Design a protein with these regions (language model features):
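N-terminal alpha/beta PP-like core and its mobile active-site loop of ThDP/TPP-dependent enzymes
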Residues: 1-117
Length: 117
């Protein structure tokens, strides 16, 4: 059995679910997933300049296509910057999947950099 990284497994799962693009702003906690998407033709990452734009684009994608729009952000402020777009999607009942990072388990609940409880 071939060994697969968690990031490649996430990219494969998203592609199998019919996700063709992921909107987001690259951050260190997402590098494994971005690596899993790199070079693939069935799914790609569309980089934005602000996480709120990624959430709004995922919302628009969900409304237009009826298929889940996916947005990704790094932990801490990256995740909180998604809130307006995600709230907008929730209000409109559009299908949106949000993937965010988190601190390493050893740093959880220790007020580590960019931790949100």
């Amino acid at each position: 059995m071939a060994v697969m990284s968690a990031g490649h497994a996430v990219a494969d799962a998203l592609a199998r679910l019919g996700v063709r693009q992921v909107f987001g702003m690259a951050g260190s906690c997402m590098l494994e997933i971005l690596d899993g998407m790199h070079g693939r033709e069935d799914i790609y990452f569309l980089s934005v300049r602000h996480e709120q734009a990624a959430a709004l684009m995922a919302d628009a994608w969900g409304r237009i296509t009826g298929r889940p729009g996916v947005c990704m952000a790094t932990n801490g402020p990256g995740a909180t910057n998604l809130v307006t777009g995600v709230a907008n999607a929730w209000q409109a009942q559009s299908p949106v999947l949000v993937i965010t990072g988190a601190p390493m388990m050893r740093d959880t609940f220790r007020d580590s950099a960019q931790e949100i409880d």
